């Protein structure tokens, strides 16, 4: 019998690889042009394994977007803890916000490109909002966390 902790660690590593590879492919080729088979090959996992993690391409696309935004916001929070933003004067908050936008443009162009591609894909695939509920709620949690520290 396999060690449950080791198994979970392997699954987490495989999931991380899938998300990272999918992000790279989606940015390089656009979401529409990338198949689940392309992702499975590039991530060196079987198609069945990929579909066990993400039963549909839309679920993977949403997971990639949520993961990338979480990583970006975590990095931003590491540079200046979001909880400390409310402790600074309004002008410094404005500077922090502008610096964040500039940093994103200069250092996170792939995320911006992916985000634009994500919006187009979701809009033009005719997906209904029910399929995006988890994604919107994850963004809502991040947004609420940020807004809670502005006042």
Tell me what each language-model feature is.
Residues 1-29, 34-42, 59-62:
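Basic, helix-initiating cap at the start of DNA-binding domains
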Residues 8, 15-16, 36, 58, ...:
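Short, structured helix-loop boundary elements
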Residues 66-72:
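Short, basic, alpha-helical segments at the C-terminal edge of helix-turn-helix-like DNA-binding modules
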């Amino acid at each position: 019998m396999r060690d449950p902790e080791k198994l979970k660690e392997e699954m987490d590593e495989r999931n991380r690889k899938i998300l990272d590879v999918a992000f790279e492919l989606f940015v390089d080729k656009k979401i529409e042009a990338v198949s689940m088979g392309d992702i499975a090959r590039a991530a060196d996992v079987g198609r069945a394994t990929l579909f066990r993690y993400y039963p549909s391409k839309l679920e993977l696309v949403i997971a990639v977007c949520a993961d990338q935004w979480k990583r970006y916001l975590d990095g931003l929070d590491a540079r200046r803890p979001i909880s400390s933003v409310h402790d600074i004067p309004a002008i410094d908050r404005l500077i922090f916000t502008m610096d964040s936008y500039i940093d994103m443009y200069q250092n996170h162009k792939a995320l911006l490109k992916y985000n634009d591609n994500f919006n187009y894909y979701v809009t033009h695939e005719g997906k209904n909002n029910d399929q995006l509920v988890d994604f919107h709620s994850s963004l809502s949690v991040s947004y609420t966390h940020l807004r809670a520290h502005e006042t």
